[in-house]
Amino acid sequence: MRLLLASNSPRRRELLNLSQWSFQVVMGEVNEHPLPSERSSEYVLRLAQEKTKSGAAHGNVGDLVIAADTAVVDRENGAELILGKPQDALEARSMLYWLRGRVHRVYSGVAVLRIGDINPLSDVCITDVPMRNYSDEEIEAYVATGDPLDKAGAYAIQHPVFKPVERLQGCYANVMGLPLCHLTRLMMQMGETPPTDITAACQQALGYHCPVYAKILSGVRLYK
């Protein structure tokens, strides 16, 4: 049995490496346009599921395919607004101004498919993200690094200088793009026990004391 990660995200590779599972990276190309009236949770879950099926083309029967999709979501006039990757520095700057000093949500769908099965196991992780009141000068300096341009919402929670988030109370790895406790739970349902304590490895690597991992691993849903 091989483990395949259907993703070209370096952050997802970095996070999955913490598990000490041996895996191979494959492409999981899908159409990422939301469907009409599709909720954010439905959107990321659908894309994660579709990515596993796309990635399955690179494996053999019995192999496991992991995939995830993450969306930064804000609300405007009561409607969900998905913030993708900025097209340029101007849009990155605009997103950072918009998010400053406010709380938005990050949704990640994660799915695991055993090749040969019809459908993957899947779940959604949701994290409330409180952005700090960073200055205009900090925005300009961060945008000048180019880092926001390949990030949904135009920021990386783990950036060592900008540090855009404060007082996070949810899953940090989710905001980076791969909620490891949700993945662990799905893998164990597949009969695959991680070779290491993923929760400890995640917290140590990210420098974050996670207050929710035990509830997630036990199957508690933190958001309705």
Language model features with spans:
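Short loop/helix-cap segments at secondary-structure boundaries that form the rim of catalytic
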Residues: E14-L18, L35, A57-H58
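Short glycine/proline-enriched coil/turn segments at helix->beta-strand junctions
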Residues: S19-S22, N60-G62
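Anionic-ligand binding patches
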Residues: L3-L4, S40-K224
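Short glycine-rich, Thr/Ser-proximal phosphate-binding strand/loop in the N-terminal lobe
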Residues: Q20-S37, P120-D123
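Cofactor-binding loop segments of dinucleotide-utilizing enzymes, especially the Rossmann-like FAD-
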Residues: N8, G28, I115
